[in-house]
């Protein structure tokens, strides 16, 4: 699962501009840190960084466009759009809402890990830090058709209180929180939501309290619900979530065949956001806008 190599830094941002008449990102709902509708490729002007190209196509869940990621064959790296990051106000709780569509005949890795998709990092690492070996990385992704929420903290192996997300296993560690049932099995848009809250700490006893929260929803239905989670130790009393990373990734040899995915109507906030209002739909098909 958490075997992704430390993500390389993508130099200077060079985005192709789309004409001014394209709709800008949707205004963030109340309480949101930021929102992105992917209606045009000018993400850099909306706070995104560490990305080189963005392919915006039609057939969106809402608005004029959505972002497309493509693997052209079983051996290829992700193409069309690059990974990208967005900082937000530091917070001890974070929520995400986005719409995900997988191409017809989508294939899984055949393992209990990958693909990776969306990630959160914290103030304990830099704005350029890779997700695979951090003080805490959270994952929201579909694995084997289930919704997986996960966490790793491999960089804490040498910290005074050590790892909180399980022991090292072949160079990685992680705790997984999966839906009980397979949820992704078609080529339709689905609303993916997750909410994480850092556990509190007991400084007098020098230990974490088991009150962290991990929750996930698919199309408005609660499918993951854990309220006894430890995400940090007393080594990190000032830890906050502050960075979102969008980085679809299949490890070498894990991609079954050529396929695509699309993401739309992303919102990051401090509380659960919820699905789009009923009736807010696509603006129709269009060609790519890179």
Show where each model-derived region lies.
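Extracellular glycan-recognition surfaces and repeat-rich motifs
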Residues: 42-70
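Extracellular carbohydrate recognition
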Residues: 208-210, 253-265, 274, 278
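Flexible glycan-contacting loops in extracellular carbohydrate-active proteins
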Residues: 226-262
């Amino acid at each position: 699962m958490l075997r992704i190599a430390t993500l390389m830094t993508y130099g200077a941002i060079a985005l192709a501009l789309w004409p001014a008449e394209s709709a800008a990102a949707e205004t963030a709902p109340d309480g949101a840190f930021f929102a992105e509708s992917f209606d045009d490729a000018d993400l850099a002007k909306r706070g995104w960084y560490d990305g080189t190209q963005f392919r915006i196509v039609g057939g969106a869940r809402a608005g004029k466009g959505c972002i497309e990621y493509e693997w052209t064959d079983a051996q290829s790296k992700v193409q069309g759009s690059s990974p990208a990051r967005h900082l937000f106000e530091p917070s001890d709780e974070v929520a995400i809402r986005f719409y995900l569509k997988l191409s017809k005949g989508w294939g899984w890795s055949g393992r209990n890990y990958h693909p990776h998709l969306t990630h959160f990092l914290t103030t304990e690492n830099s704005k350029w830090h890779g997700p695979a070996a951090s003080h805490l990385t959270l994952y929201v992704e579909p694995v084997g058709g289930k919704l997986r929420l996960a966490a790793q903290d491999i960089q804490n192996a040498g910290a005074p209180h050590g790892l909180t997300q399980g022991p090292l296993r072949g160079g990685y560690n992680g705790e997984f929180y999966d839906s009980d049932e397979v949820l992704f099995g078609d080529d339709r848009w689905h609303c993916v939501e997750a909410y994480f809250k850092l556990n509190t700490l007991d400084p007098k006893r020098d230990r974490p309290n088991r009150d962290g929260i991990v929750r996930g929803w698919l199309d408005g239905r609660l499918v993951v619900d854990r309220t006894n989670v430890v995400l940090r130790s007393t080594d990190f009393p000032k830890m906050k979530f502050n960075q979102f990373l969008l980085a679809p990734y299949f490890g070498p040899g894990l991609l079954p065949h050529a396929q695509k995915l699309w993401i739309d109507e992303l919102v990051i906030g401090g509380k659960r956001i919820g699905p789009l209002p009923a009736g807010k739909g696509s603006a129709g098909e269009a060609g790519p806008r890179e």
